Curated annotation (Swiss-Prot):
Superkingdom assignment: Bacteria
Species in which this protein is naturally found: Bacillus licheniformis (strain ATCC 14580 / DSM 13 / JCM 2505 / CCUG 7422 / NBRC 12200 / NCIMB 9375 / NCTC 10341 / NRRL NRS-1264 / Gibson 46)
Keywords: ATP-binding, Magnesium, Metal-binding, Nucleotide-binding, Nucleotidyltransferase, RNA repair, RNA-binding, Transferase, tRNA processing
Name the record gives this protein: CCA-adding enzyme
Key word RNA-binding present: yes
Residues at which Mg(2+) binds: 40, 42
Other facts: A single active site specifically recognizes both ATP and CTP and is responsible for their addition.
Gene that specifies this protein: cca
Entry function: Catalyzes the addition and repair of the essential 3'-terminal CCA sequence in tRNAs without using a nucleic acid template. Adds these three nucleotides in the order of C, C, and A to the tRNA nucleotide-73, using CTP and ATP as substrates and producing inorganic pyrophosphate. tRNA 3'-terminal CCA addition is required both for tRNA processing and repair. Also involved in tRNA surveillance by mediating tandem CCA addition to generate a CCACCA at the 3' terminus of unstable tRNAs. While stable tRNAs receive only 3'-terminal CCA, unstable tRNAs are marked with CCACCA and rapidly degraded.
Lineage, broadest ranks: Bacteria, Bacillati, Bacillota, Bacilli, Bacillales
Amino acid sequence: MEDLFLKALPLLRELKKHGWQAYFVGGAVRDAQMNRDVGDIDIATDASPEEIEAIFPKTVDVGKEHGTIIVLFEGESYEVTTFRAELEYEDYRRPSGVQFIKSLKEDLKRRDLTINAMAMDEEGRLIDYFGGLRDIRERLIQTVGDPAERFHEDALRMLRALRFMSQLEFELSPNTKKAICENRPLLAHISTERKTVEFEKLLKGKAAGRALEAAAETGLYKELPGLDGKKERVLAARAFPFYQLQKSADIWAAFIHMISINPAEAHRFLKGWKLPGKVIRQALHTAERIDQKWDAVSMYEAGEETLLAASAIRSLRDKQAIDEEQLAEIRQSYQALPIKSLKDLAVSGSDLLNFRKKPAGKWVSDDLKRIERAVLNGELANQKKAIEEWLDSCSQI
């Protein structure tokens, strides 16, 4: 049993000591079976939220009405959820309510995919009612029960299926793929924000290319912001290894570049995904510089972060790998610039007013820009006296 499970074991045993069932569930169980790094440990029990709160002194109510309590235990936080059955779903996205139950099997039955519907007891024994382990061995994404029924309950599960396909490097089972083809319009009922979270996770997976291909094959791409009518462009993005990029803005910059969104459309396209303004600005700033031929001025205007991001994206596009040696040279070139921002200039707007003895006006910013370029291009030393003499000579021409 993994160390993270062992650390949480006393919590499981405490629930059992009080007469309740308790099991490890969810992604941690799946990842342990796949020998992947285990993340958050989740626990399911037949104890009610109130009974969980009565057993453990430190708890946080994060959704008691849905049966979920955070238990703070030995310096860690664990999500402990009461076995539940979900009542009828509304709007293809959420249940009208939940009913607390006593059966682990019925609780696992409501989950989306077989690989996410396994449990593990305190002895490390796997409880697998729906063939999750079989699907792990066969590397298949398969819903628990009828896929059409699962997708009608929550249409986001179709996109989640592709996301797990990307992250785990699995394939869709034939009946799951068929159900996505038939039910994809239901994704229109899901908020853009939820779709964006899943799609970004999809792009970060090692098999994003195969998942994008599945999105094209099933038509699911048509239900995503700004992608309807762009099947060939979506397929063109398959070749890019997005997982090698760390930052959200860089991933979106690479995506709009690979699907050939032109600069005039790019802002509207990214806004359509309801991304944070900062991510949009950074993505646009990077995307427009991916094919930039760098000189001192363009490096200065880009800034180090964008310079390196744009260069990494170009390297990944052309070589399928980041050329670390080339990036080191680019970083060195940037560090060698005489100035990194306007405030690094040896003169300010006030200095120019003193030099020129003229009323303030647009000429101040124009002169600063001229000085900036001359310094960057090595035509002028970044020294106050040299700049004053240079301005004098310019004004006499």
